[in-house]
Amino acid sequence: MRSLKLALLATVAVVGITSAASAADLIIGSEPGPVYDDYASVDWSGPYAGLWVSGQTGSIFGLGANLGVNVLIDKNLLAGAEGSVAWLSDDSWQGQVHGKLGFAAETFAIYGLAGIGVNSITDAYAPVGVGAEVMLADNLSLKAEYQYKWDLDTSADDAHVAKFGFNWHF
């Protein structure tokens, strides 16, 4: 009788341990969660308009507006053209057009630029420089540019220019 009790106790113990070890959550046709992209895709192509402020050698400050267009030639190769007008703190004005070529990533772009400009004091100049732009929202970007304005009449009026502004992309 004692061996029967011992066998019954051993059987209950084995069944109890095995039942607890095999308990698990039941999986019934669960749907996979949503898939998210690791980055936000930005299309730099198309027209844009913007406003900017500038500072240049000789303590001259400017306030300007620009219109431009960008084209993605390849996945990351950006080309564009831009025209701008500005009022300067020395009571002069300037207008310029330039082309740009650079690299566009998901939310930022870097580029080189070159063009031609005129102003009310020194007549003609050639701007060359570099710029960077970062997309802040779907259609709004922040830009920063450095330009060297090479005066085509005299080197005495050459200038270093820093521009900061916003562009609205259509």
Each language-model region and where it sits:
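Alpha-helical transmembrane segments and their juxtamembrane interfaces
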Residues: 12-15, 108-110
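Cleavable N-terminal signal peptides
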Residues: 10-11, 18-21
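Gram-negative outer-membrane beta-barrel domains
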Residues: 3, 20-170
